[in-house]
Amino acid sequence: MTRHWPWEVSLRMENEHVCGGALIDPSWVVTAAHCIQGTKEYSVVLGTSKLQPMNFSRALWVPVRDIIMHPKYWGRAFIMGDVALVHLQTPVTFSEYVQPICLPEPNFNLKVGTQCWVTGWSQVKQRFSANSMLTPELQEAEVFIMDNKRCDRHYKKSFFPPVVPLVLGDMICATNYGENLCYGDSGGPLACEVEGRWILAGVLSWEKACVKAQNPGVYTRITKYTKWIKKQMSNGAFSGPCASACLLFLCWLLQPQMGS
């Protein structure tokens, strides 16, 4: 049985899934900046594990009011500041199926080897290709936090001369040596349970990680942007508690009833 991740968001462009995201507040979603393409019409779907809900009795469809890109975002060629805030047209109501994930404090630090989870609608495979198809049901993969220097060395072998830094301080790596999420899940959450709370450690940034199964996932490190995120929100405060481990367990038990 698949767990239920109540903060998971499908970011839609003209009603087509383009990226994942994480709900952090009734009115706000965090995703990757590189997911955003100009002034297209965006919306989000949440409260369901299905990519194409048959009805919206529990699933929510919400138009997007505004999207705020981080000013340091450089673009796909050399990704820095790969984080964006999605402001929803109307606040969502929390339920068993819709809950926010906690933002980490700026000084929060995850130890190497910490167990975390990544989620999204791409195929979980040992071998990836650019033609990987989206799956109708939300997928999950267990991953472990990886040392940034080791992660950087891994990618330098494949892409750049050794003197060029790739994995920067605003990034965080996680791996499970072959099982990872791939195309279609940029912006999706790297979620870690710490002392009974679920923390948004990162959002998926590098799709080049899909090229080889052994490549670690590279995520935008949310601690580097917590202050910026809170500043963009109207009062910097959250309207409800973020998801606890106890609540997630309850959601997991209720998951078979979702069906929408």
Swiss-Prot record:
Protein name as catalogued: Putative serine protease 45
The gene coding this protein: PRSS45P
Keyword 4Fe-4S applies: no
UniProt cross-references to PROSITE patterns, sorted A to Z: TRYPSIN_DOM, TRYPSIN_HIS
Family from the record: Belongs to the peptidase S1 family.
Residue span, Peptidase S1 domain: 1-234
Pfam family, one: Trypsin
First-tier enzyme category under EC: hydrolase
UniProt keyword list: Disulfide bond, Glycoprotein, Hydrolase, Protease, Serine protease
GO biological process, one term: proteolysis
Active site: 34 (charge relay system), 82 (charge relay system), 186 (charge relay system)
GO cellular component, one term: extracellular space
GO MF entry, a single one: serine-type endopeptidase activity
Annotated InterPro entries: Peptidase_S1_PA (IPR009003), Peptidase_S1_PA_chymotrypsin (IPR043504), Peptidase_S1A (IPR001314), Ser/Thr_Proteases_Immune/Dev (IPR051487), Trypsin_dom (IPR001254), TRYPSIN_HIS (IPR018114)
EC numbers on record: 3.4.21.-
Intrachain S-S bonds: 19-35, 116-192, 151-173, 182-210
